[in-house]
Curated annotation (Swiss-Prot):
<dbReference type="Pfam" id="PF03033">
    <property type="entry name" value="Glyco_transf_28"/>
</dbReference>
<keyword id="KW-0133">Cell shape</keyword>
<feature type="binding site">
    <location>
        <position position="166"/>
    </location>
    <ligand>
        <name>UDP-N-acetyl-alpha-D-glucosamine</name>
    </ligand>
</feature>
<keyword id="KW-0472">Membrane</keyword>
<dbReference type="GO" id="GO:0071555">
    <property type="term" value="P:cell wall organization"/>
</dbReference>
<keyword id="KW-0997">Cell inner membrane</keyword>
<dbReference type="Pfam" id="PF04101">
    <property type="entry name" value="Glyco_tran_28_C"/>
</dbReference>
<keyword id="KW-0328">Glycosyltransferase</keyword>
<dbReference type="GO" id="GO:0008360">
    <property type="term" value="P:regulation of cell shape"/>
</dbReference>
<dbReference type="GO" id="GO:0051991">
    <property type="term" value="F:UDP-N-acetyl-D-glucosamine:N-acetylmuramoyl-L-alanyl-D-glutamyl-meso-2,6-diaminopimelyl-D-alanyl-D-alanine-diphosphoundecaprenol 4-beta-N-acetylglucosaminlytransferase activity"/>
</dbReference>
<dbReference type="GO" id="GO:0030259">
    <property type="term" value="P:lipid glycosylation"/>
</dbReference>
<comment type="function">
    <text>Cell wall formation. Catalyzes the transfer of a GlcNAc subunit on undecaprenyl-pyrophosphoryl-MurNAc-pentapeptide (lipid intermediate I) to form undecaprenyl-pyrophosphoryl-MurNAc-(pentapeptide)GlcNAc (lipid intermediate II).</text>
</comment>
<feature type="binding site">
    <location>
        <position position="191"/>
    </location>
    <ligand>
        <name>UDP-N-acetyl-alpha-D-glucosamine</name>
    </ligand>
</feature>
<dbReference type="GO" id="GO:0050511">
    <property type="term" value="F:undecaprenyldiphospho-muramoylpentapeptide beta-N-acetylglucosaminyltransferase activity"/>
</dbReference>
<dbReference type="GO" id="GO:0009252">
    <property type="term" value="P:peptidoglycan biosynthetic process"/>
</dbReference>
<dbReference type="InterPro" id="IPR006009">
    <property type="entry name" value="GlcNAc_MurG"/>
</dbReference>
<feature type="binding site">
    <location>
        <position position="125"/>
    </location>
    <ligand>
        <name>UDP-N-acetyl-alpha-D-glucosamine</name>
    </ligand>
</feature>
Length: 383
């Protein structure tokens, strides 16, 4: 029996690798448990309970990129966050604590380290975030997804495993065999959409009119641009499924011949595992421009093309879609190279190390817990 506490979140890019780890842990043994720690404002407050896992909350804010007053407020909140973290850890008694980035991971992982609980962090991006850079000095293991991140951490702690992918997405993708006659383009910009991508894609339609009978689009717009984008496709006579949010990404990937999207770490992990050619448009306001650094790894491998949003026009995007559609051999090459970067076993490798950390510290049966605690059954994911 093993109990893993996963700390962090805030965005899907941080949280979903943690969900993937949780799925791997609870499927290994019916008595394994996973508990998450996050913030009320983060995406975890909605997603984690829906997935069937317990969630503890701490009140903590980021320190980087704030004005003076906001920084003071965040600093004053830190002691309380540490106290909350110690209480949660004492109550939950995890065998291992894994930080996945985001505000909550800092105080929780640091408190676990001070309590002698084995710790690890998982860095999703090629350019590590502030919290993980700090935590990398004290944790036992640092899991990275890009070779470029290695230089930011103590070499002996680093393990390159890739970004864990949710079991549901992988299993459904492998079962999906969607036949389609038209060249299918999947367009999305994250769960909230991306106005820059939405605008450039609808502008690109003006230069793709002669291909409208051979193209099909699946476009996730987010809430704000849904109606305007839907109208753009309809007015120009293109076949398109325009939705606010795609619930079944595995089927969307299975149907796609080409993907136009941002360059978040989780998205890139999905592209490589699903072996998809892509046009990447990094989020221009990402911290330290980390999405562009992420994208560069795929571009250098020949698996993707990248355009800066500020330099990309609708006409240029249309030209790129046209060229890739006209050269299927190039698309196949990009797909093959994307697949070579994929790491479908990342969650398994991460869970294996968690087991090793538990055994090294507590023995094969983990920490001693009261009979009532020991009989608790791990909440199961709905995935």
């Amino acid at each position: 029996m093993m109990k893993v506490l996963i700390a962090g979140g805030g965005t899907g890019g941080h949280l979903f690798p943690g969900i993937a780890l949780a799925e791997e842990v609870v499927t290994r043994h019916h008595r394994n448990e996973v508990v998450f720690v996050g913030t009320e404002r983060g995406i975890e407050s909605r997603v984690v309970p829906k997935e069937g896992y317990p969630l503890e909350l701490v009140k903590v804010q980021g320190l980087k990129g704030k004005g003076f007053l906001s920084l003071l407020k965040a600093l004053f909140a830190l002691p309380l966050a540490f106290i909350e973290s110690f209480r949660i850890l004492a109550r939950q008694k995890p065998d291992v604590v894994v930080g996945v980035g985001g505000y909550a991971s800092g105080p929780v992982v640091m408190a676990a380290w001070l309590m002698g609980i084995p710790t690890a962090i998982q860095e999703q991006n090629a350019l590590p975030g502030f919290t993980n850079k700090v935590l990398g000095r004290i944790v036992r293991v640092v899991f990275i997804a890009f070779e470029e991140a290695r230089a930011f951490f103590p070499e002996k702690k680093v393990q390159l495993i890739g970004n864990p992918i949710r079991r549901k997405l992988m299993d459904n993708y492998l079962r999906s065999h969607v036949a389609h006659e038209r060249f299918s383009v999947l367009v999305f910009g994250g769960s909230l959409g991306a106005r820059g991508i939405n605008q450039r894609m609808t502008e690109a339609l003006d230069s793709l009119g002669d291909l409208k009978d051979s193209l099909h689009f699946v476009h996730q717009t987010g809430k704000n641009d849904l109606e305007s984008v839907r109208k753009g496709y309809a007015d120009k006579g293109f076949q398109a499924e325009v939705v606010e949010f795609i619930d079944d990404m595995s089927s969307a990937y299975a149907r796609a011949d080409l993907v136009v999207c941002r360059a978040g770490a989780t998205t890139l992990a999905e592209l490589t595992v699903c072996k998809k050619a892509s046009i990447l448009i990094p989020f221009p306001h990402a911290t330290d421009d980390h999405q562009a650094v992420n994208a560069r790894a795929l571009v250098d491998a020949g698996a993707a093309l990248m355009f800066r949003e500020s330099e990309l026009t609708g006409e240029k995007l249309a030209q790129t879609v046209r060229e890739l559609k006209s050269h299927p051999e190039r698309l196949k090459s990009m797909e093959k190279k994307a697949g070579l970067l994929g790491r479908p076993e990342a969650a398994k490798e991460l869970a294996d190390v968690c087991v090793d950390l538990m055994v090294q510290t507590w023995g094969p049966n983990g920490r001693e817990r009261t009979p009532i605690e020991a009989e608790k059954k791990a909440p199961r994911s709905n995935s």
